[in-house]
Amino acid sequence: MKKSKKTLRQIIALMAIAFTTISLTACGGSDDDGDKDDLITASEYLPGKEWTIGNETYSFYKNHLLVCESSANVTTGGLTSQAYLYFGTWQLDGNRLTAAITSSTQPNFDASKFFHGTYSNVHTEKDTSGGTISSDKPGSITITEPKPYIVGTGTDGKSCYIYYHKNMTEDKTDETIHDRALHGTWYNKVQLTDTKNGTMKTYEAKMIFNADGTVQFVIGDVIDFTTTYETKNGTVTLGSYILKDNPASFIYLQYGPVVSLYDVSQTRYTCDRWYNTPQ
């Protein structure tokens, strides 16, 4: 029994040392200009991550697309409300951040309720909260140091705090006019009307994005043409889509094996999903 008490005291002592160490690490250089220089800049830190602003979490894609996703909620009657996506753009010019949510899969949404505006003096600051200590198994202690957060000043003079949520490992986008996230061959099923007898027929469709700014559509043995595309701020503009002489623009999201193309208006939206393997 005495041995058990001694072991417990040792564990408590180790945890106390760990807490002391992380506290000193977090606070030791808070007034030291040299320590501030070690912080990553906001322009390097912001892209490709999810950030919490107020009560919402936003995805800051590397191609400057800004996305917020609402959660599906269970209502009083036991029904599940629909989850919505909110799309916009973000730009960081020097230390000035501009952001706005401009469209959504929710009809007639209120854009003013979401993160928007221009913020100056945007910079990172070190979180001095002390981090967390956890133990997954006896004798094992994990120390998690806090991530720096981002601060900016709005046009009203108030500070805006942007807190790190998680890294977006699935973000393969870039800010070029031929975003690499789209590159490759994508498959779908497409229904076309047979001009001979007026019946609908389902075909396997291929959409092939090339790095040179061309995209080829191949649908069964009835359609095969090549057109051009350009990307900007998470929107792709196509010279034609599926059919010739059918120009189109979409907000695009690429998650692993799927590319989702959203056509969003004020009152409705459509979403075409293309896959990296035949369906």
Language model features: what each stretch is:
Residues I22-A26:
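C-terminal motif of bacterial Sec signal peptides marking the signal peptidase cleavage site
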Residues A13-T21:
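Hydrophobic helical h-region of N-terminal Sec-dependent signal peptides
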Residues K2-A13:
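Bacterial N-terminal signal peptides that target proteins for export
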Residues G29-F87, Q91-T226, T235-Q279:
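Lipid interaction determinants
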